[in-house]
Amino acid sequence: MKKVAIVGLGWLGMPLAARGWQVTGSKTTLDGVEAARMSGIESYPLRLEPELVCEADDLDALLDVDALVITLPARRSGPGEDFYLQAMQELVDSALAYRIPRIIFTSSTSVYGDAQGVVKENTPRNPVTASGRTLKELEDWLHNLPGTSVDILRLAGLVGPGRHPGRFFAGKTAPDGQHGVNLVHLEDVVGAITLLLQAPKGGHIYNICAPAHPARNVFYPQMTRLLGMAPPHFRDAPDNGKGKIIDGSRICNELGFEYQYPDPLVMPME
C-alpha cells in the first residue's frame, strides 16, 4: 500500500484519508492536529508563512511517503498572490528534498478565465482573477519540475457536504442565467485523486467536472428551494449562449474514470 501525505486535511483531504490509504497529513493548528489524530489520521502541525514552519522530526514523518497530495486552495482574499505561490514552491521543494516521486496538485478551472464554449485541457489559459493567475503560474512551475511526476487536477466548482450550492446565490441578482453550471461533487474529486494514486505513472493534467451542465436559471432556483431560501434572480443578455462549459471527459477516456455524480441536479449535497 502506498503511503500518502495530504497537505490540506480539509473537506477534501479528510474523505481521501478515509478511503483507506496509509495517510499522513498536516494541519495549521494544534487543535486541528489533535482532531485529525482522533479521526485516526497521523497528523502534524505545518504552516506556510510562506516559508515552511514545521519541526524537523514532524517534517520527516510527514514527508516519508510515496506520494504528496496538495489540496490547499489559492484564496481570493487574504495574503497576496506571491504569498501562495512562494508557499507552494517551498512545500514542493521540501517534497523533492525527500525524493517523493509523485505529486498531485488540485488546481482550478479558474485558470481558463472567461473562455467561452467547450473548454478542454488544451484550451488557452487566460485567468482574470488574482487566484487564477497564481494557479496558472504555479501549474507552469510544477509542470517543468525535474525529478518528479506531477499530476494537476483543474477542479470545477466544488459541492457536497458543507458546500450546498443553494447558498451560493440565494436571494441575489446574478447575470448569465442561460449559462451552464460547471460543478463537481466532492466524492468525484476524491475518486479522481484515488485513481491517479493507483496509476503507474503521473504527469497528467485533467479537468474534473460533472458531464451535465444545467442552466444557472434552472439549477440555482431548484437548489434554493431545497433549502427553503429565496431563489436568485438572473439577468439575461439576449443570445448570450451557454457560456463556458468545462469538459471533464479526458480522464474518463484515458484512465477509465467514471463520475459517480454526473448530473448536478441530482447530486447529494449533505
What are these regions (language model features)?
Residues 136, 148, 160-171, 187, ...:
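Glycine/proline-rich active-site loop of Rossmann-fold NAD(P)-dependent oxidoreductases
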Residues 152-155, 164, 174-197:
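Substrate-positioning beta->alpha
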Residues 39, 44-65:
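Conserved Rossmann-fold cofactor-binding substructure of NAD(P)-dependent oxidoreductases
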Residues 108, 137-161:
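Conserved beta-loop-beta element that borders a ligand/cofactor-binding pocket
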Residues 90-128:
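Conserved Rossmann-fold NAD(P)-dependent oxidoreductase catalytic core, especially the SDR/UDP-sugar
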Residues 63-104:
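NAD(P)-cofactor binding segment of oxidoreductase domains
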Residues 42, 46-50, 239-270:
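C-terminal amphipathic/interface module of NAD(P)-dependent oxidoreductases
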Residues 190-195, 199-248:
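Mid/C-terminal beta-alpha module of Rossmann-like enzyme folds, strongest
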